[in-house]
Amino acid sequence: MAEDEIWTEKYRPRRLEDVIGHQQITRRLISYVKSGNLPHLLFSGPPGVGKTACAVALARELYGETWHSNFIELNASDERGIDVVRNNIKNFARTAPLGEAKFKIIFLDEADALTSDAQSALRRTMERYAATCRFIISCNYSSKIIEPIQSRCAVYRFGPLNATDITTGITRIAKNEGLKIEKDGMDALIYVARGDMRRAINALQSAATIAKDITADVIYQTTSTAKPKEIEDMLKLALNGQFMDSRNKLDELLITYGLSGTDIIDQIYRSMFELGLDEDVLVALVDRIGEADFRLTEGASERIQIEALLAHFKMQGAARSK
Ligand SMILES: Nc1ncnc2c1ncn2[C@@H]1O[C@H](COP(=O)(O)OP(=O)(O)OP(=O)(O)O)[C@@H](O)[C@H]1O
């Protein structure tokens, strides 16, 4: 294998039993393989948790050697438009499946990026080729998929992977690549991954370019993530009434790590539960974080939103000490 190969590809599960986590889903997919038939499928869930990996492993097991000819992966949100996607489907569906197979599989990634009109066009395409093709539609949010498509599919919801799953995946790769992962290094990988195995593997590969001994410092440095402790320190300063100091800490984090506003908000959200705050204080702060998060997606100033959030930490801290 090439030295510079991307590890997420190199370690893509070949078989359904190699997929980590999602046992209930893989069990049912294996039963499709055994029966030699499957309905249209809708895979929904966050990025990097194994939706594509499951679809490819399913095709490999179903078709064996001929899987490449009987499986196509298309990006539904192809920027050239839904007509290009439909043309690709048409060309692929035109020829009969190879080998023993009764149907071909069309894997459509990012279907939730399609407008409702484009999804309606897709639905008609699904119907037209239903005799010779099965569709596996992948999306982050099933609520963004129109009802007529959802009702034609068996829906599988992929959740984020838990810490044990990430540890299993990372340990497997580290062993093969001759890396030593320190306990704090693994904790950092789990923190950075946020349930996304792709993110964990990419973080490991970047870290491996600078060290064979993977520590938390290496992970935070190579992924431009602030250490949870630094975020906690910033929040504690605000809670203790030292608003200007917490603001300086924010500056330091922005400069050191080049964090985006949404990165910091996400980290603040995760750190605040470690501060031993009363439930009613947490409730008030979570409410504010939700607000700031929404405003950022609407294009508000990152700097002002985060400072406003720190101001709320200060106000809650002051109310708490009364
Ligand atoms: N459950 C898993 N078990 C083992 N490896 C995994 C798992 N999930 C992800 N990976 C690794 O991460 C890579 C990316 O995963 P995959 O392409 O399946 O994500 P996805 O859920 O389809 O994401 P997206 O929504 O972004 O397309 C895989 O090639 C594999 O290396």
Swiss-Prot record:
Sorted alphabetically, which InterPro entries does this protein's record hold?
Answer: AAA+_ATPase, ATPase_AAA_core, DNA_pol3_clamp-load_cplx_C, DNA_Rep/Repair_Clamp_Loader, P-loop_NTPase, Rep_factor-C_ssu_arc, Rep_factorC_C, RFC_lid
Does this entry carry the keyword ATP-binding?
Answer: yes
Instruction: Give the multimer and partner information.
Output: Heteromultimer composed of small subunits (RfcS) and large subunits (RfcL).
Q: Which organism is it from?
A: Methanocella arvoryzae (strain DSM 22066 / NBRC 105507 / MRE50)
The entry's family comment says: Belongs to the activator 1 small subunits family. RfcS subfamily.
Q: Which GO terms describe its cellular component?
A: DNA replication factor C complex
**In the UniProt record, what gene is named as encoding this protein?**
rfcS
Protein name, entry field? Replication factor C small subunit
**SMART domains, per the entry:** AAA (SM00382)
Q: Which GO terms describe its molecular function?
A: ATP binding; ATP hydrolysis activity; DNA binding; DNA clamp loader activity
What's the domain of life for this entry? Archaea
What job does the chain carry out?
A: Part of the RFC clamp loader complex which loads the PCNA sliding clamp onto DNA.
Q: Where does ATP bind?
A: 45-52
